[in-house]
């Protein structure tokens, strides 16, 4: 995370950090998991990569929003939850649901949660998210899900950074 507290940074320093965050790659750890998975463990590797991708996105998203909006520790913790994310950003003039890929962030979070807590069973919220996922059945085709979600979450992260940068007059 940032070495200095957001309160001690000038607007120009915050803008510079946010612009440098546009170079962040969300899928580094996930791609490493996939590479190490080999052919035999392809689906298992992609399953674990989805969890790693979600973790990476959430960490970087929270870091960027906390920095840009000067959130306190309690707000930074709450920004991880969709309703609070919408509310906190709305107060600062950002319509989170209008940001490209906002639903992808929710889907990725639900997928990671289902993998971690539901033994990779498709939950009600994920039913038909992909044509091959049906509620109550085990998730399948993790490689296809990963490909779609990794591309979409990168777009969402960039769009979120663009909105945060615009708060500081950047483009």
Regions found by a protein language model. Name each.
Residues 1-132, 145-171:
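Amphipathic alpha-helical interface elements
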């Amino acid at each position: 995370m940032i070495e200095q507290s957001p309160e001690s940074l000038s607007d120009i320093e915050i803008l510079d950090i946010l612009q440098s965050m546009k170079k962040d790659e969300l899928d580094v750890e996930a791609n490493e998991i996939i590479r190490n998975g080999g052919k035999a463990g392809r689906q298992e590797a992609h399953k674990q990569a989805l969890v790693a991708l979600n973790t990476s996105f959430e960490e970087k998203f929270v870091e960027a929003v906390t920095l840009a909006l000067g959130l306190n520790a309690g707000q930074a913790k709450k920004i991880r939850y969709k309703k609070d994310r919408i509310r906190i950003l709305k107060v600062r003039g950002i319509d989170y649901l209008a940001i490209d890929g906002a639903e992808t962030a929710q889907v990725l979070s639900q997928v990671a949660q289902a993998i971690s807590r539901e033994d990779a069973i498709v939950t009600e919220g994920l039913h038909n998210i992909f044509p091959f996922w049906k509620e109550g059945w085990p998730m399948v085709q993790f490689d296809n899900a990963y490909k779609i979600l990794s591309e979409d979450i990168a777009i969402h992260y960039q769009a979120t950074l663009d909105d945060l940068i615009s708060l500081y007059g950047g483009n």
